[in-house]
Amino acid sequence: MPMKIRLGMMIFSIIFILILPVSLWGQSKKLPALKQEAVQEVDKLKDFTQQMVDMIFSFGELGFQEFETSRYITTILRENGFSVEEGVSGMPTAWVARWGQGNPVIAFGSDIDCIPKASQKPGVAYHDPIIEGAPGHGEGHNSGQAVNVTAALVLKRLMEREKIAGTLMLWPGVAEEQLGAKAYFARDGVMKDVDAVLFTHVSDNLGVSFGPDSSGTGLVSVEYTFKGSSAHSAGAPWRGRSALDAVELMNIGWNFRREHLRLSQRSHYVILNGGDQPNVVPSLATVWYYFREVDYENIKKSFEIGNKIAQAAAMMTDTEVSWRILGAAWPRHFSKPIALAMYDNIKQVGLPAWSEGDQTLAKALQRELGNKETNGLKTKLTDPPRLYQGRNFGGGSDDIGDISWTAPTITLRFPSNIPDLPGHHWANAVAMATPIAHKGATAGAKVMALTTLDLLLNAKLVEQSWAYFKNEQGKETQYQSFLSAEDKPSIHLNREIMAKHRPEMRKYYFDPSKHKTYLEQLGITYPTTRESADKKTQ
């Protein structure tokens, strides 16, 4: 190659290399002003955020059946220029939405499913279901996508105007209550090109953590099916082989074994099928187990013990047993660099200004539940995140754990609910379509927007998060999925329950063209307490 050409190419390469940092440096100088503008823009969208919170609350869909919710969110995203891929990992309600070009790729996730039998009128501080026995948002999963979509729309406007490189990716936590989706996303490489994952989850404060989970577990969700042979329960019971007997013996065996397991394990089961009627020996019976532990090896051991006990129960009853994994969740590990950056933004945003009505509702609900403390909503931020040095004695699980082992991940906890509630309960739905949830979601959207700007305009933060991911988080632990290549999502779950309740629930879907809020549509005076309701009826 001639010397002049080589020299020209070298000069061009040097200039090209220099231009990118200079451009990014120029944009990063604007970061404080862009952050201030982002906060203002989120505030301008607070009515939109409120509508999303209320609409998804009114759908109240159980895991794998979140059709209305996914249709609603993806319609909004398409209308705002996002491309949407549906049916991700074989799940009809799973999707991935993208906008932008190039790196970094920032993925926003939040769960969308609800809780069985948790139907509840919002803003009412005692049990008063919208529809008796119907599902409802008794964990508050109606709020997180409103946080993410609001932040994404604000960021899109700023990125377009400022010509900021990067890609925004939004996705739903489908069937989180069944731990049914995110392990499949991880297995199938949905996050393979992602630079950082910002997940959101409802809480009673603004907060973020890093490092190994201090009070949570991973799990494997397993369905055991026993097959026997039927017979007349009175006329010829000796000719039958009871699958239900096998289920009961498995449960008894597991319950005796509990004493000899680690303190950090948690396990629970429900009998899905115990037979048809008493005078027929059950030829088929099914039990569903969650085996929880604080690390992969001990989750696997619990699963193996459960399998042995199931086989023993089958031998005792002369039945056959098979099992299949319905879902799984790895223990969570969150990114220190991103968490510290996010906490700086949390301090900048601060907690919402709660009204007297907000506090009245919170305190009344706490009294209704018999709580020792009835101090209402939090008015002080959580402490800065720090590495937990104590022992993890177990707790709940979230399949965001699997995602956290595929890319640097954090979970933003935002203040849309009331402190000290039971969880998975009608009480956790009381605040979730009220000003408490609306204000908390707006605060969360601000933190998400600010932290994403940090990642977009500070390449060093992305580099640090990956260094932590590889050198600290992955130093001694390597992710191994509980799923095989043949395992498929359990999309049959909750189908019959939703088919039963959805026709009646449709009558109560929020209509923002006629009503400003869901409270207004339902005719609820905010807040409604036992005392105020009693006065109204006198």
Cite the ranges covered by each PLM segment.
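Bacterial N-terminal signal peptides
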Residues: M10-S23
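Metal-dependent amide/peptide-bond hydrolase catalytic core
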Residues: D245-Q538
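Divalent metal-coordination and catalytic microenvironments
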Residues: I56, A97, F108, H141, ...
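Bacterial N-terminal signal peptides that target proteins for export
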Residues: M1-F12
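Histidine/acidic-residue-rich, glycine-tolerant segments that coordinate divalent metal ions
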Residues: H127-G136, N142-S143, E160-P282, R292, ...
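Short, flexible, mixed-charge acidic loops at enzyme active sites
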Residues: A118-H127, D213-G218, L421-H424
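Acidic/His- and Gly-rich active-site-bordering loop/insert found
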Residues: S28-H137, A146-T167
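Soluble non-cytosolic domains of exported or imported proteins
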Residues: D43-D47, G63-R71, N142, A146, ...
